[in-house]
Amino acid sequence: LLSHYHAVRVLGASAYGAEHIIASEDTRDLIVERGQFDKDSEIGRFPRLFQNVESVPDGLTWPTMTFNKKMTLWLGKLEVQILQLGRGHTKGDTVAWLPQEKILFSGDLVEFDATPYAGDAYFKDWPQTLDNLAALKPEKLVPGRGAALQTPEQVQAGLAGTRAFISDVYESVKASAAQGEDLRKVYEATFA
């Protein structure tokens, strides 16, 4: 399952040799539109990590199956819901929800003890998407980065921490832009 189109997800997935690779239609569209650029950018920014980039099979990992909004899989008796609950980190954000176990795999919509990457973010939508995740009432959550959240209290802390960062950045940028500040001043005010 590709949680979104970023190279950190799409480059390494081929190493698993999976028969099927699932992505949302939005994620597939973003791989088509930006995947190669994102791959080249990652390689350029982190050459130490890509010393043997030619060893990555097939470069980008392409989905073999796509879905729109929801797909349900059964792994024996285990129900796995693959959901798009809104935009946030990217347009194609996808989560995996195990309703019987109340475990949520959030992709990069939630990051714990890590700063969320927001280069492709939908700041206005992300808080509502976090509300949509919370509405599932997960008791455990595996974030895109950071330790697994093992209790409902930790899950709430992870959601709240991500929300606080996104909201703080958005409100700071919005206030600076309303004052007509140039980009450098907006950056300085936001990350001061």
What is each stretch, according to the model?
Residues 5-11, 28-31, 90-93, 111-116, ...:
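Active-site environment of divalent metal-dependent phosphoester hydrolases
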Residues 6-9, 24, 60, 103, ...:
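Solvent-exposed, acidic/flexible segments
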Residues 79, 189-192:
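Divalent metal-binding segments
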